[in-house]
Amino acid sequence: MKRFLFIIMLVFIVVMIWVSVHDKEDNQSIPEKFEKAMRLTRMETYHDDDYDYTVRYPSFFEQTDDSLMAKGCCRFSFWQDSTEIVQSTFVEQNADSLTLEQAMTKYASELYATQQQKGDSSFILSGHIHADDGRMTSRRYYAKFVQHRKLWFVQSLTYPEDCEKAVQRLIQEINDWKVW
């Protein structure tokens, strides 16, 4: 009987140790979990039928509807607890026939861009998202604007500041994005 109780106690201790070791993953922060998921996930491809462009997004992102979305727009998001990461694409008319330099200056000013990078037919802006009253928030954006005739194709990513490292794969996808 003593041997049986000893074995039961030993099994109980082993199970408790195993649970405590495997429970550590649940103690990871959301940015750590997201970074791990981004390393392991496969990328899906969305094709826009209206403008014939494609966008790659993580398989665990959910395609979400937005009542303000117009023709040529798509939105993919990840939401857990208070962490929201949104990847979106839209097409905008270049009604003022702005050159690449003029558009970069205009949008950098409107979006309070802290970093700007110009390419051959595109530019990239990034910075903090500002609240309506002008205050900086703890969220950031990264956006690529691609010029094609009288249109701007824009792919953007918004994310919490503490997820900067975790979204690097998505930022690289945006950097590599070609409309056609």
Task: Please report, for each region that a protein language model flagged, where it lies by residue.
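Extracytoplasmic/periplasmic, Sec-exported soluble proteins
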Residues: 38, 49, 53, 95, ...
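Hydrophobic single-pass membrane-insertion segments
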Residues: 19-28
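Conserved polar/disulfide-associated segments of primarily extracytoplasmic proteins
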Residues: 64-162
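N-terminal "mature-domain start" segment
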Residues: 31-69
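Hydrophobic membrane-insertion alpha-helices, especially the h-region
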Residues: 5-20
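N-terminal hydrophobic targeting signals that begin at the initiator methionine
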Residues: 1-2
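Surface-exposed amphipathic alpha-helical segments
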Residues: 61, 151-180
